UniProtKB/Swiss-Prot annotation:
Site of covalent link Glycyl lysine isopeptide (Lys-Gly) (interchain with G-Cter in SUMO2): K309, K384
Family indicated by similarity: Belongs to the UTP5 family.
Gene behind the chain: WDR43
Phosphothreonine: residues bearing it: T321, T394, T656
Protein name, as recorded: WD repeat-containing protein 43
Bias-annotated ranges (Acidic residues): 600-652, 664-677
Extent of Polar residues compositional bias: 582-592
Taxonomic source organism: Homo sapiens (Human)
Amino acid sequence: MAAGGGGSCDPLAPAGVPCAFSPHSQAYFALASTDGHLRVWETANNRLHQEYVPSAHLSGTCTCLAWAPARLQAKESPQRKKRKSEAVGMSNQTDLLALGTAVGSILLYSTVKGELHSKLISGGHDNRVNCIQWHQDSGCLYSCSDDKHIVEWNVQTCKVKCKWKGDNSSVSSLCISPDGKMLLSAGRTIKLWVLETKEVYRHFTGHATPVSSLMFTTIRPPNESQPFDGITGLYFLSGAVHDRLLNVWQVRSENKEKSAVMSFTVTDEPVYIDLTLSENKEEPVKLAVVCRDGQVHLFEHILNGYCKKPLTSNCTIQIATPGKGKKSTPKPIPILAAGFCSDKMSLLLVYGSWFQPTIERVALNSREPHMCLVRDISNCWAPKVETAITKVRTPVMNSEAKVLVPGIPGHHAAIKPAPPQTEQVESKRKSGGNEVSIEERLGAMDIDTHKKGKEDLQTNSFPVLLTQGLESNDFEMLNKVLQTRNVNLIKKTVLRMPLHTIIPLLQELTKRLQGHPNSAVLMVQWLKCVLTVHASYLSTLPDLVPQLGTLYQLMESRVKTFQKLSHLHGKLILLITQVTASEKTKGATSPGQKAKLVYEEESSEEESDDEIADKDSEDNWDEDEEESESEKDEDVEEEDEDAEGKDEENGEDRDTASEKELNGDSDLDPENESEEE
């Protein structure tokens, strides 16, 4: 039982190549390479058995494949004979190979006929097919896709039997239970379905990344004393993309425990898994895991309850080339797939190149924790050329054959035999012949002989060049595109870039930002366009922070020093302007101007005369003050005397007035008196 590297759901991750051994006998090894070709190899003699190229192999590449189960024995009474059509259908199904494509269709290829058997399209998937599983009893198959649905197909009628939604996100892996009544499906979480009712029986936690492989590890539960319903107590294994842990789960009667009971740890992401089923509680499970780094890890463990610590491999297998000479060093050879043989004591290893793999049977030795096999595969990769490659091929004709050519009936043109290839063709021309020059020929053909100026590169070629440069790490090609200064050209190029090249482009821009300042200015324009145009795509990436962490730290460091640089820039401008102004005014003559105020310093003799004059002036000033005070006193005395005289006159007037009132005399006029009366 094996699970091949079907495909990664991450667009940025390198996709695994779908491959699988034929069931039971493992006589064939099917491999769908990246060029869209299906190749079937014989494992016994490492020979190519068949090769099939689908019509849409470039647009609809193969994403997963699965062999049909071995020949089924129908449970019928001996009196009833099997129909001829049923027998033919059963034998044909034995050698069918199901291929899932990136466009949602499923192809059934017959290895017996060497041609396409049928195609499953109508009512199926609308997106990439991630996994295919054949049912071992009913002659149907199940498929899951990125469109979130699971489809049950009838292989005989090529129609959909049932279709239901498997998850809120894409469904990446499937596995059918040993009794054929349950189905495991996984996106990030794992669900156990009842096939009869299409209802969820159990939920499991799953992995943080999309699950790439699912398989049951046991047929019977460890506790055989309790009644067995076909699923309770069984263990199954799951592996995920970018996850170095393989988790083991147990289906229990209660629905409380949803976490894994144990896990196996490997060195890298698993791309191919094969195991031997445990038929009783005392038989250990043997597990072979092929990692992306090209190593094979072998595990052997009895599944019996919970284990807290992750289990490490019992044996690790590597393959390397022999070092030729003292200076040459051995190079590792990647292992592509590994499967247990029927005796469970040996292993089939597929290593080398996907286009020309090498298949070898290796005996297992549990005593050695590490095995390194030295293999020379240089001869296997060399293409065999039987005939010389020539551009010109002459047809082989019989000397007695007659060749008919157009002409008048009855007249036969003489056919000269072709000259042998050993003769040399004369390359010298006859001198003195009247030969027309090339310029005259072009003039006669009315062709413009003037050379056209060098045209500018078209905009649509920039995305192609940039994509090729990022994939091949071509420095000259990247410089040709990234050193452009036209902002409109940069925007159009970024708009036409494929989505899977955005992260490599940002990483290349980050690398160039750390270089020369002149190139960093150009990279800032590219970076601005990428972040503005593809902001929605970047926000959907789950691992955006670790991928763009270097760019973020670089921007933060540049922003921190911006204020200091601006202050320094202002000071430098001030100093430079002052220096330039002083240099300009140094040589120029200033125009004549009159001083608004002139201060002259006096000598020491003048200062002494001034001091004497100041003293005299101070003495005179004191005398003047005394005289002014005496004059003020005299004036005050005179004013007092005048005031006393006036007071005396007023007193006399008052006395006379009072006497007149007493005597009845008044100073009123007669008219006034009459008025009073």
